[in-house]
Amino acid sequence: MRVKKGDLVEVIAGKDRGKRGKVLRVIPREDRVIVEGINIVHRHMRPTPDMPQGGIVKNEAPIHISNVMLVCPNCDEKTRIGATYLEDGQKVRKCKKCDEVVDK
């Protein structure tokens, strides 16, 4: 997967199209990511010893990786990502629009 935890992404399809958020978790087995503040769902929780009132809790649900696009930290645009190798042989991600390295 070309998106990693901590990356800034923009949603390109679905009810949250155009919104940006930070990737909280990547689920490679299902090709999904959990993005902060995106795809909010309401869970109805029954009363438990930890939460005696119960109630409705808002959580982020996973969104398919094809519905998000990485935002380049250098040019601040949503972009496709390519891979390249540095002189020392390390593989890094590269922005297709500005040709800058995305990885720290």
UniProtKB/Swiss-Prot annotation:
Keywords for the protein's UniProt record, in alphabetical order: Ribonucleoprotein, Ribosomal protein, RNA-binding, rRNA-binding
Record bears the keyword tRNA processing: no
GO cellular component terms attached to this protein's record: ribonucleoprotein complex; ribosome
Keyword Ribosomal protein: yes
GO molecular function (one): structural constituent of ribosome
SMART domains to which the protein is assigned, alphabetical: KOW
Domain of life: Bacteria
A Gene Ontology biological process term: translation
InterPro entries: KOW, Rib_uL2_dom2, Ribosomal_uL24, Ribosomal_uL24_CS, Ribosomal_uL24_KOW, Translation_prot_SH3-like_sf
Subunit structure: Part of the 50S ribosomal subunit.
Family assignment from sequence similarity: Belongs to the universal ribosomal protein uL24 family.
Function: One of two assembly initiator proteins, it binds directly to the 5'-end of the 23S rRNA, where it nucleates assembly of the 50S subunit. One of the proteins that surrounds the polypeptide exit tunnel on the outside of the subunit.
UniProt-listed NCBIfam families: rplX_bact (TIGR01079)
The protein's name in its UniProt record: Large ribosomal subunit protein uL24
Lineage of source species: Bacteria, Bacillati, Bacillota, Clostridia, Halanaerobiales
